[in-house]
C-alpha cells in the first residue's frame, strides 16, 4: 500500500509507525493544542488534546479487550476494494470509476479524506465546490448534470443538513447514490434487498465499529438521537438486523432521560444541546458520534459534556464511512459493467389483436398506441443524454453511444434482400419488421431493425409509404413516411448550397481579375487579411506553404483564387424530394443579373444526392466531414478534379448535416426498436441504410442479439452493393441473408402477365398455377446462387398472400432448399404480426450459428472495366459488357485522377437481372451496355449507368396524393399506405 493512507490516518490523529523518511504534515489542529514531545510522532491535534483531557480516543472503553485499530480496519476495506477493482480492470482495461463529490463550503478535511482513499483504491475523484449558500435548485442542477454523465459511477453530497431536502436527495440517480440516501435505495434496504441497493456508509460504519469494539449487538438496546431522514432509517434497520432493539427520537423528546438510561448504545446524529445534562447518559453506555459539520470543515470531536469512557468518535466513523463509500463505488462500477454486457432487454412489448380481414395500414398503425420514445430508449439501454426527443414517438441517438459501448461484443447481423421484384414490391420491409417482432416480442431475443428513410417522392407518387405493412410496420407510419426528423431536408439544403457555390464561383471568376477575386476571397477585416482554416487547406493542397496573405506571389494568387471549373464537366446537380419529371433537364442562369452565364442542368431526386450516400456510409462526424470535402463536383480545364473542399464549403455542409448523422429511433407495432436512417435508392445508389445505425444497433443488442437490415430491390442490386460497398466501408460482415420471395413475383418470372402498379392483377396471380410458380423459381435459384458467391448462408422467407395455396407454398420452399438455401419458411407477419414469423426467426437463429465464409466478389485494385465485367457476368449473367465512348472517356479520366481503386455501384433497372425491364426470369446471352460512368468520390464508389437510368422519377396519371388528406378536426392524416 502506498504512503497516502498512512499519512491520512496520521492527519486524523491515529498512532502510526513511521514508514520511510519523516514527512512534514499539514496539521488539522484545534487552537491552543500543544506539540507532542514523542519523537515518533503523533502530530499535535485532535488526539493530543483528548489524551491531555483524559479522553479515550480508541473504540473501546477501559478494561475492554483491545479492538483492531482504525488503520487496519480502513486498510482492509480499501485493500479489498482495490483488489476487486483490479480484477474488473483486467477484463475491462479502459474502465476507470469516477466519484463526484458535490460540496457546499470549504471542507478541506473531508476533501482530503475522499481524495486520498479514492487514489489509494485506484478511483478517480472530482470535487464540485458550490458556495455555502447554494439554493436547492442550484444543487439539483448540478446533480442532474452528473446523473446523465456516463463517465461518473458515483455521486455523494457533502452539504449542510439544511440543504438536504427530500427533493435534493431524490434527484440523485439511485444507481449512482453511493451514500444510499434516495428513497429507492432506502426502500430496497428496508425490504431486505441490501445486495441490490447501496447501504449508507455512515450507518454501516457505525454498526461495524461497535462490533469491532467487541460489543455483541444481539439483544442490546440502541437509541438513535438527533438523526433524521436516510441516516436514521439506515441506522435503525442495520441495528435491527443485528438483533438489537432500536429506538429513535429527537433531542427535544420529553422521554429522552428515560430512553438514555435504558439504552446500551447511544448513536448521536447531531450535536447534543447544551441544556441536556451529560448525567442523563449513564456511565458504561457506548456512544457513537455520527455528526459532522460540513460547512465548518471541522470534525465534531464529540458533543460537549458527553461522557467518553466508551466514545466512538466521529472521526472514526467518518473515516470508515469514507472507506465504505469507496467500497460502494467499486460495487457501482461492477454493476455498471454488468449493465454494459449482454443482457436480455426488459422490454414491454405491445400486444396485437389481429383482425380479419386485415384493415388498411394506416388504420392498423392508428389503432396501436406507441410507447413514449424515452421509455423505449431506456428499455434498450440508452442513457437519457444519449437521445434527442422529437415529439412523443421518435428520437435521435447520439454517436457518443459507440464510445460508451466500444468494448461490447457485437450481435448477429442479418441482411434482408429479395428476388427480382414486381413493380409492387415483394415486402422486404414487412419481412424485416415481422422478423424483429418475432425475435423480440415472441422469442424474447434482443433485436433491432435498421431501415432506410423513405423519400417523399414515391410516398406521393405511385409506390406509397415504406413503413412495412399490415401487422408488421413501423409506427406512427405517417411520421415515418413524411418528414421524420428532417434528414432529407438537411441533405437537400446541403446539396443545393454546394450546387449554388459551383455556378457562383464560375460567374465570379469570369467577371473579375485575379487581384479583385483574391481580395474578395481574403477580405480586409479591421485592416488585416487572414486565411480561413479551409483556405489554408487549399494552400497546402496547392503546395503553397504560406500563412500570410500578403506574401503570395502573383502566380500563387492566381492558383489560389481560380478553380477554372470546366462547365461541361460539372456532375453536381440540384435536388428536390419530389417526383417532378419537368426538372429532368433545365436551363439555369437566364436572369439578367447572371451576365449571360447560363448552362443546361437538371434536378435529381434528393435521395440520389451523393450526400445521402455519404450519410449512409460514414462512421463518424469526422469521417463525414472528410467525405463531404472529398466530393468531386467537376473537373478544371486541366482535367484535375474540383472538390467541395476547393470551393470552401465543407464546413458549412457539415454544419447542415450535423444532426442528420444521428440515427432516428422509432418502434414497430409490437414495441420493438427500429432505427430509420439514410435512404439512398438501390437502383441509382447503393440502396442501404446507414453504417452508423447498424453499428450502434449491434452494440445495443449484445452478443446474443440480432440486427436485421434491408437492402433495396433484388439481391442482384441491393445485396451485391451491400457486400461490395457497405461491408467494405463498415468492416461488418452479415451472418445470414434472408431472401424474400412471393408467389406473385415467381409467377411473373415464370411467364405470367405483366404486373403494373395501379392495375388489378390478372387471374393467373389470384388462382393456383403450379407450373408458373415452378418455372419462375429460376429467378429465386439465381438469387440464392448470388448470395452464395459471398459465402453467407441463405434463408428464404416466402411472404405469403391470402391468394397463395398450400401446394404453391410447399413447392417454393422445396425448390429453394434444393437450390442450396439453409432453410425456406412461409411467413404470415402481414396478417398475424411477429407471431406469423416465429418459424422464420427460429430458422435465422439456427443459420446464424453456422460459420460464415464471407468473401468479396472482386479486388478493388482491379481496373474499373474489369470490376464492371465481374459484376455483369457473375451476378447478372451477362455475356459481356459494352462501353459507350462517353463511358470509356470517363473511366480513363477517373483512372488518371487516381480513383480507379474504388468499388463499383451499378445503376441499373431493378425489374430484371438484365438492363431490359421486361426480361424476366434469368435472361441469358445478353451484352450489358454501359452508357455513362460517374463517380461519387466522397461516398467512395464509381457508378456506371446501365442503359437509360433516370435520377428524377415522374408522377403517374393517378398519384397517391389523390388519397391523402388531413382531418382538420383531429389533425389525423388519411390515405397513406
From Swiss-Prot:
<feature type="region of interest" description="Methylenetetrahydrofolate dehydrogenase and cyclohydrolase">
    <location>
        <begin position="32"/>
        <end position="347"/>
    </location>
</feature>
<dbReference type="GO" id="GO:0001843">
    <property type="term" value="P:neural tube closure"/>
</dbReference>
<feature type="modified residue" description="Phosphoserine">
    <location>
        <position position="356"/>
    </location>
</feature>
<comment type="pathway">
    <text>One-carbon metabolism; tetrahydrofolate interconversion.</text>
</comment>
<feature type="region of interest" description="Disordered">
    <location>
        <begin position="29"/>
        <end position="71"/>
    </location>
</feature>
<dbReference type="GO" id="GO:0005759">
    <property type="term" value="C:mitochondrial matrix"/>
</dbReference>
<dbReference type="Pfam" id="PF02882">
    <property type="entry name" value="THF_DHG_CYH_C"/>
</dbReference>
<feature type="modified residue" description="N6-succinyllysine">
    <location>
        <position position="595"/>
    </location>
</feature>
<keyword id="KW-0496">Mitochondrion</keyword>
<dbReference type="InterPro" id="IPR046346">
    <property type="entry name" value="Aminoacid_DH-like_N_sf"/>
</dbReference>
<feature type="transit peptide" description="Mitochondrion">
    <location>
        <begin position="1"/>
        <end position="31"/>
    </location>
</feature>
<feature type="modified residue" description="N6-succinyllysine; alternate">
    <location>
        <position position="188"/>
    </location>
</feature>
<dbReference type="GO" id="GO:0035999">
    <property type="term" value="P:tetrahydrofolate interconversion"/>
</dbReference>
<dbReference type="GO" id="GO:0042803">
    <property type="term" value="F:protein homodimerization activity"/>
</dbReference>
<comment type="similarity">
    <text>In the N-terminal section; belongs to the tetrahydrofolate dehydrogenase/cyclohydrolase family.</text>
</comment>
<dbReference type="InterPro" id="IPR020628">
    <property type="entry name" value="Formate_THF_ligase_CS"/>
</dbReference>
<dbReference type="GO" id="GO:0005524">
    <property type="term" value="F:ATP binding"/>
</dbReference>
<comment type="similarity">
    <text>In the C-terminal section; belongs to the formate--tetrahydrofolate ligase family.</text>
</comment>
<dbReference type="GO" id="GO:0015943">
    <property type="term" value="P:formate biosynthetic process"/>
</dbReference>
<keyword id="KW-0436">Ligase</keyword>
<dbReference type="InterPro" id="IPR000559">
    <property type="entry name" value="Formate_THF_ligase"/>
</dbReference>
<dbReference type="InterPro" id="IPR000672">
    <property type="entry name" value="THF_DH/CycHdrlase"/>
</dbReference>
<dbReference type="GO" id="GO:0004488">
    <property type="term" value="F:methylenetetrahydrofolate dehydrogenase (NADP+) activity"/>
</dbReference>
<dbReference type="InterPro" id="IPR020630">
    <property type="entry name" value="THF_DH/CycHdrlase_cat_dom"/>
</dbReference>
<feature type="modified residue" description="N6-acetyllysine; alternate">
    <location>
        <position position="188"/>
    </location>
</feature>
<keyword id="KW-0597">Phosphoprotein</keyword>
<dbReference type="GO" id="GO:0048702">
    <property type="term" value="P:embryonic neurocranium morphogenesis"/>
</dbReference>
<dbReference type="GO" id="GO:0005739">
    <property type="term" value="C:mitochondrion"/>
</dbReference>
<dbReference type="Pfam" id="PF00763">
    <property type="entry name" value="THF_DHG_CYH"/>
</dbReference>
<dbReference type="GO" id="GO:0004329">
    <property type="term" value="F:formate-tetrahydrofolate ligase activity"/>
</dbReference>
<feature type="binding site">
    <location>
        <begin position="422"/>
        <end position="429"/>
    </location>
    <ligand>
        <name>ATP</name>
    </ligand>
</feature>
<dbReference type="InterPro" id="IPR027417">
    <property type="entry name" value="P-loop_NTPase"/>
</dbReference>
<dbReference type="Pfam" id="PF01268">
    <property type="entry name" value="FTHFS"/>
</dbReference>
<feature type="region of interest" description="Formyltetrahydrofolate synthetase">
    <location>
        <begin position="348"/>
        <end position="977"/>
    </location>
</feature>
<dbReference type="GO" id="GO:0048703">
    <property type="term" value="P:embryonic viscerocranium morphogenesis"/>
</dbReference>
<dbReference type="InterPro" id="IPR036291">
    <property type="entry name" value="NAD(P)-bd_dom_sf"/>
</dbReference>
<keyword id="KW-0007">Acetylation</keyword>
<protein>
    <recommendedName>
        <fullName>Monofunctional C1-tetrahydrofolate synthase, mitochondrial</fullName>
        <ecNumber>6.3.4.3</ecNumber>
    </recommendedName>
</protein>
<comment type="subunit">
    <text>Homodimer.</text>
</comment>
<keyword id="KW-0547">Nucleotide-binding</keyword>
<keyword id="KW-0067">ATP-binding</keyword>
<comment type="function">
    <text>May provide the missing metabolic reaction required to link the mitochondria and the cytoplasm in the mammalian model of one-carbon folate metabolism complementing thus the enzymatic activities of MTHFD2.</text>
</comment>
